[in-house]
A protein has these predicted regions:
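His/Asp/Glu-enriched, well-ordered alpha-helical/loop segment
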Residues: 26-27, 47-48, 53-54, 59-131
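Short acidic, glycine/serine/threonine-rich loops at helix termini
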Residues: 1, 16-21, 64-68, 141-143
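A generic local structural motif
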Residues: 38-42, 116-118, 151
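Histidine/acidic residue-rich metal-binding segments in metalloenzymes
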Residues: 1-54
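C-terminal cap of metal-dependent C-N hydrolases
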Residues: 72, 122-177
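A short acidic, glycine-rich active-site loop
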Residues: 28-38, 74-78, 151-158
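Short, glycine/acidic-enriched loop or turn micro-motifs at the edges of active sites
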Residues: 11, 60, 135
Length: 180
């Protein structure tokens, strides 16, 4: 029929399964976490190109909205601040994905699929992020810039941190505390 179809997943579906669930609003997301076998199928789909995008699924909620346990909390978790470092540490460094493939999944492919400009084209308004790939730290929700702090990854060791983001040719974010 000529219908264009794409497929995405998010870091929490690649790194967690239903065995990881806790009675805590930080674990309430839609769709919910599935089985270990489902998680393995998603990883295979990312590796073989069936899944073209890893999105953040960023759904920030206040502490109040996420404090009502698994059943009563608002749906969704934050993902923006921890998506890249999680994927780099747990998918690239072990060899499941290359860094180039991760960049395509998180940046190039979404831009292409949605027909967005940006990137690094001569004469265009640059969109890019500079990453400190050697930066190792633990995910600390208190350090998030988003209004949401609800992440099932609190305390997880990660690697790779955004130190500069340029959007439309203008600096949008700079981490002045990290040496390049």
């Amino acid at each position: 029929r000529g219908v264009r179809v794409s497929c995405e997943t998010a870091p929490h579906y690649l790194l967690l399964c239903d065995e990881d669930l806790q009675e805590d609003g930080r674990f309430k997301m839609n769709p919910p976490l599935r089985s270990r076998e489902d998680r393995a199928a998603l990883i295979a789909g990312v590796a073989d190109g069936t899944i073209e995008v890893i999105a953040t699924d960023h759904a920030p909620h206040t502490a109040e909205e996420k404090s009502r346990g698994l059943a009563g909390s608002a749906m969704g978790i934050v993902g923006l601040e921890c998506a890249f470092p999680l994927m780099y540490k747990y998918m690239v460094l072990p060899g499941t994905l290359t860094l180039e493939k991760l960049v395509a999944l998180m940046s190039d492919n979404p831009r292409r699929i949605f027909g967005l400009g940006g990137g690094l084209n001569v004469g265009g308004e640059a969109d890019f992020t500079v990453l400190a790939l050697g930066a190792q730290y633990e995910i600390d929700p208190a350090a998030f810039l988003s209004k949401g702090r609800a992440t099932p990854f609190a305390g997880w060791p990660v690697q790779g941190r955004a130190v500069l983001t340029v959007v439309g040719g203008r600096e949008a974010y700079r981490d002045d505390g990290l040496q390049l």
